[in-house]
Design a protein with these regions (language model features):
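Hydrophobic helical h-region of N-terminal Sec-dependent signal peptides
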Residues: 17-25
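N-terminal Sec-pathway targeting helices
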Residues: 3-18
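Mature, Sec-exported extracytoplasmic domains of Gram-positive
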Residues: 36-431
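Hydrophobic single-pass membrane-insertion segments
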Residues: 27-39
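Intrinsically disordered, low-complexity sequence elements enriched in Ser/Thr/Gly/Pro
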Residues: 7-8, 29-30, 55
């Protein structure tokens, strides 16, 4: 006992410290052992099987995939027409839209021979990407569509079966539901099937764009629904319409000439009127003849006159035009003298050249079309020209009477112009 007391007295503190250490170590080891035991006995919760769960999940995924596929398909179809106005909802049912697309493909099948030898190239998604599509091919396509009973049109060509548009417009004016589809053959060969719908006092268009694969195989490239703000079929025969939301950087209104125009009037328009401006200079907006021809002379007019005379785009050097070229063309095309030209059109004696003044495009300009003509005994021709200003809903804004003198070499001279205001004010012209 004494030995124990002595031991405790001499080493008591050390013994107590060792006991404390042992206890602490035991606690720590016990905690770790407990954690290990918990980890060993823990099992993931048991899943209670539900007999239809996989089936329902599979169906949901399938439905989502279908919806995504339809959305992607519709998005892909319309993506190339992102710049055009779109309606939030369509007046047509899905079945009606499907029938219109089927009919468009039937119409396209009529044209396989026209497109069978086309060459395709890389290009924009909204174009046909046909390397070359001629005016003759466009006219043949319009004729074939017309013979098959479709309303069809292309630039500078009379519309086929135009009576259908007249019937549609008559129904619209009587507040009767109606539809009509126009097949437009564009310059690049793309065909736009535009269906106008009047229903529930609303106007819309449903557009189906038809492109072409090699060998003349048609395909639907685009579809689009757009709200229409107004339509107008003029007495002279222009179908003019406006989108509810106008196309950015485009005309205020779109149009087709519905009633036919004679080939001779189209020929005279192309030769004498096409390319002349009502807004950039005074040739068409001033009453003039040989006595006051100086009133229409200004440098900016030469670019258009050069193109009409030569069929080419004017190119200049240092913004000057050689005097011999300028004076030859202007004295041929107008009853003017060289002296008058040099006084009015920016002639520079040192360089023997004329100033080139660039024409900047004006928004929404009118254009002229020959609607009548008279071949006079003296060899001149009198043209009756209507100013068409579709952007302001007019196909006869003003009327020009232009006298021209054709020459044996194919050139001609403008001799005079008279303009009469009709539905709209005459533009101011150049400065």
């Amino acid at each position: 006992m004494e030995d124990v007391k002595w031991l405790l007295k001499k080493y008591g503190f050390l013994i107590v410290l060792m006991v404390i250490i042992v206890v602490i170590i035991s606690i720590i080891l016990g905690k770790r052992s407990s954690e290990k035991n918990v980890e060993k006995v823990w099992e993931p919760p048991v899943e209670i099987p539900f007999s239809n769960e996989n089936e329902i999940r599979s169906n949901n995924i399938a439905e989502e995939n279908i919806e995504e596929s339809e959305t992607e398909s519709e998005s892909d179809t319309e993506s190339s027409l992102w710049f055009l106005p779109k309606a939030e909802n369509c007046l047509l049912t899905k079945a009606e839209k499907s029938r219109l697309k089927d009919t468009a493909m039937v119409a396209a099948e009529q044209l396989k021979d026209v497109y069978k030898d086309i060459e395709l190239e890389e290009g924009v998604s909204y174009g046909s990407n046909i390397r070359e599509f001629t005016k003759e091919q466009r006219r043949e396509a319009v004729s074939l569509l017309g013979n098959a009973g479709f309303v069809s049109v292309t630039e500078d060509t009379n519309m086929e079966n135009h009576e259908e548009i007249e019937n549609f417009y008559a129904a619209y004016m009587e507040n009767r539901d109606a539809m009509v589809t126009i097949y437009e053959v564009n310059r690049d060969g793309l065909i736009g099937a535009v269906t106008f719908i009047y229903r529930d006092n609303r106007l819309q268009t449903y557009y189906v764009g038809i492109g072409w694969q090699g060998g003349g195989i048609p395909e639907i490239k685009d579809t689009l629904v757009s709200d229409i703000a107004e339509i107008n079929l003029t007495e002279k025969g222009y179908f003019i319409y406006a989108y509810e939301n106008p196309i950015a950087h485009s005309s205020l209104r779109q149009y087709w000439r519905v009633k036919p125009l004679s080939d001779k009037c189209r020929e005279l328009t192309a030769k004498y009127v096409y390319g002349l401006s009502y807004v950039n200079y005074n040739v068409l907006v001033t009453n003039w003849d040989s006595n006051n021809v100086e009133d229409i002379l200004m440098p900016c007019m030469f670019e258009d006159i050069y193109r009409i005379y030569t069929g080419e785009i004017l190119s200049t050097e240092n913004w000057r035009i050689p005097a011999d070229i300028y004076e030859k063309i202007m004295t041929t095309c107008f009853p003017v003298s060289i002296e008058q030209l040099r006084e009015k059109c920016g002639y520079d004696e040192d360089s023997n050249s004329y100033e080139y003044e660039m024409i900047f495009a004006s928004p929404y300009p009118p254009f002229g079309e020959v609607v009548d003509y008279t071949e006079n005994p003296d060899g001149t021709t009198t043209l009756v020209v209507d100013g068409v200003w579709a952007d302001y809903n007019s196909d006869c804004a003003f009327t020009n009477t232009i006298v021209v003198q054709p020459f044996d070499d194919g050139t001609f001279r403008y001799l005079s112009n008279l303009i009469e205001q009709k539905e709209l004010e005459v533009p101011k012209g150049g400065r």
